[in-house]
Amino acid sequence: MKLSLSVALSLAAATAQAATQFCDQWGSVTEGNYILYNNLWGQAQATSGSQCTTFESLSGNTIVWNTKWSWSGGQGQVKSFANAALQFTPKKLSSVKSIDSTWKWNYSGSNIVADVAYDMFLSTSPGGDHNYEIMVWLGALGGAGPISSTGSPIATPTVAGIKFNLYLGPNGSMQVYSFVAQSTTNSFSGDMRDFFTYLESNQGLSSDLYLVDVQAGTEPFSGSNAVFTVSDYSVSVA
């Protein structure tokens, strides 16, 4: 049977958009400007568990995906960070005009302890080691808490119209700033550049640092039959 060119192209497009699931520790798939990772970097801390991540679709710059997991043991230890990482050329903060993003997500499952967060990294050079980690937690579920030297926030800023508790602590050689939303935010639309602007103005962060990574996903600590669904995610660096 012969197919017209338009039908053939439509079938090819449908094939390209077919759901892709991966369950291996370092599994990933590249779609558009994103690399979607399973990233089970802390699975050795669990006494049992597993996780699979699925790419569902990409429309323009908007990616739809989910991850399903069950983890037990290793209380207080992160087991993974399934995330969508943006591919872009590192830029000095002084040259970054905007980091526009939208994110709609949902969680279901039993006894979930997890965070839902943007994870962004800064370096003194485009290809150098990470010096700063900037996290923006839209959800801190089941008592999940950020890295902190004191266990108490150093400030309570309002950024992008959301009230946060800001924490500071070390992660190896990096300094980690964690903005933790005071109320779970399942739908976000804003400019992530605002968080860096706040740190430059209030915490002495240098604008000479390079923005080298922008990721968004979930860090599970423990729970069962968890389903983290991202129905709308996009981000761009300009």
Swiss-Prot record:
What reaction gets catalysed by this protein?
A: xyloglucan + H2O = xyloglucan oligosaccharides
Glycosylation sites per record: 106, 171
**Top-tier EC class:** hydrolase
GO BP, sorted A to Z: cell wall organization; polysaccharide catabolic process
A Pfam family name for this chain?
A: Glyco_hydro_12
The entry's localization annotation reads: Secreted
Q: What is its EC number?
A: 3.2.1.151
* Signal peptide per UniProt: 1-18
Q: Does the keyword Cell wall biogenesis/degradation apply?
A: yes
Example GO molecular function: cellulase activity
Q: Which UniProt keywords apply?
A: Carbohydrate metabolism, Cell wall biogenesis/degradation, Glycoprotein, Glycosidase, Hydrolase, Polysaccharide degradation, Secreted, Signal
Q: Domain of life, per the record?
A: Eukaryota
Q: Which GO terms describe its cellular component?
A: extracellular region
The entry sums up its family as follows: Belongs to the glycosyl hydrolase 12 (cellulase H) family.
Tell me the function of this protein: Catalyzes endohydrolysis of 1,4-beta-D-glucosidic linkages in xyloglucan with retention of the beta-configuration of the glycosyl residues. Specific for xyloglucan and does not hydrolyze other cell wall components.
Protein name, entry field: Probable xyloglucan-specific endo-beta-1,4-glucanase A
